[in-house]
Amino acid sequence: VYILRFNEHLASLSPCDFVKEILVDGLHARWVTVGENFRFGDKRAGDIKLLEQLGKEFHFEVHPMPMLFHTHAPISSSRIRHALAEGDIPTANYMLGRPYMISGRVLHGKQLGRTLGFPTINQRILPPHSKAKPAIEGVYAVKAHGIGPRPIEGVACVGRRPTVDDHGEYLLETHLFNFHGDLYDQDVKVEFFSKIRDEKKFCSLEELRAAIADD
């Protein structure tokens, strides 16, 4: 995976400079596959026709892929993000062509879940001090992969724990059913199935405990 950081320099590249700097000099591309509505370069000036012309000049092949549709509209990253933000996991999974998952290393937490009777594995989902928001928030039915021979069902919360921390970072906290073990520093994938409810600030830990039990 080659990650391009979107910055002022990248945004200002002309279509020709984008191809020369990124595809030719950077990746030494010989075969380029893009969606049929692909646009590139400053002000989205480049299209498939121009990319094919530049491919002949710089000796790489261009293969456009046809658009895929769902409910009579093209599948796009913005539609997938919208479905995730709405908690519509089945629709997001359909457009992704795979289950939506979050993976990461299990952190040492404050043991609050254990105190409440619902121990959780905690995973950071954004870089420290990031101002970004995760693709999803709320409480979900999930399965955790990478712990044993079979996935383990559970309930996960993606949020900032407003009941106990007014300015906390976003975390993925997952309570696994019928599991007792130490997963610290292990990599775990959490697969999302359906949204149960939004994250909520409760007046007391007892109210929080009751809500978790209902979940």
Labelled PLM ranges:
Residues 58, 109-215:
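Phosphate/ribose-recognition catalytic cores of enzymes acting on nucleotide-derived substrates
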Residues 9-119, 203-207, 212:
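Classical nucleotidyltransferase
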Residues 5:
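Contiguous, small/hydrophobic- and glycine-enriched helical/loop subdomains that border
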